[in-house]
């Protein structure tokens, strides 16, 4: 078996080292190498280009029969409501920004903090009904005045609602205690029960995910795998969609076989949800830090996006079939 410098493998990006076509090559060796290649394609996060999944209302083209087995008769391709190449290109762009280095949150300056406090007070005053915790908050905030009027620092209504819900879980005795809480980094949940509380009342952020290690990322992945189907059928569906997208943005591209298996497990739960057409009507609402990088392509929702990413980025193309 002599050395060769054959063409570059379109999947693995490497040249063939040995010429396996020679007559003297042991057929068992060829069979073994083919088996190794097949195992690699099915267990490692091979990254095929998005164009290999060409779509006309997602028709999947298999250019290389060895990459993945063809769907069996009766299996139906999932129709994605967007152009695959465009969406994966958008995802790559947003992911590059998400993974870029950024400063850790170290608290607000005086101007921003006071504007935030006034915004909280104004939001609570507009609430149609208040409980004991929100009444306590508005009482603490009665005398707060902004340092300057800055329309650019006005609170987003949805973000304000989550913030007030989070603050309402604690009893603050002084304004200084409230300020201290606002200037403190959000802790990373360590248990499923904590994630259940955390997700509906906190928007995800790149700063938050940058503080998570690999173990914590996969703890969140397992929590979503176990709970996303249940919570996507509640008022928290949009919240779970946001956290799903952020998880995908911050997962490494290179994963072990076991990690790929866990990603597949989550994508199967996501796939089970897309049967419900009402769920698919939910819009994909993401924080401004993503929209500011690149507007969300038309027709994208978190569930279909997750399937597209797992299929293309992690090489699990069969996930696009029911």
From Swiss-Prot:
Primary localization: nucleus
One biological process term in Gene Ontology: spliceosomal snRNP assembly
Organism domain of life: Eukaryota
Keywords, comma-separated and alphabetical: mRNA processing, mRNA splicing, Nucleus, Spliceosome
Signal peptide: none
GO cellular component: small nuclear ribonucleoprotein complex; spliceosomal complex
Function recorded in the entry: Involved in mRNA splicing. Required for snRNA accumulation and manufacture of snRNPs.
Family per record: Belongs to the BRR1 family.
Protein name: Pre-mRNA-splicing factor BRR1
Gene designation per UniProt: BRR1
